[in-house]
Amino acid sequence: MQTLSSAPDPAVSVAVTILAILLALTGFGLWTAFGPKAAKLTDPWDEHDD
């Protein structure tokens, strides 16, 4: 049984690191899409004339 003073399993550390990176990328994507600078984003499909 692990106690709080023992070292965590390396697999748990890797899983938590990957989870943190994915959450950070998701948060950054949402902030880019809906944040304060989203009003300056343009849609290339709307800008294209046929």
From Swiss-Prot:
Main location: membrane
TM spans (from-to): 14-34
Gene Ontology terms: cellular component: plasma membrane-derived thylakoid membrane
Membrane-topology annotation of the record: Single-pass membrane protein
Entry's Gene Ontology BP terms: photosynthesis
A family per Pfam: PsbN
Compartments reported by the entry: Cellular thylakoid membrane
Alphabetic keyword roster: Membrane, Thylakoid, Transmembrane, Transmembrane helix
Coiled-coil stretches noted in the UniProt entry, renumbered to this chain: none
Function: May play a role in photosystem I and II biogenesis.
Family: Belongs to the PsbN family.
Name the UniProt record assigns to this protein: Protein PsbN
Organism of provenance: Prochlorococcus marinus (strain MIT 9312)
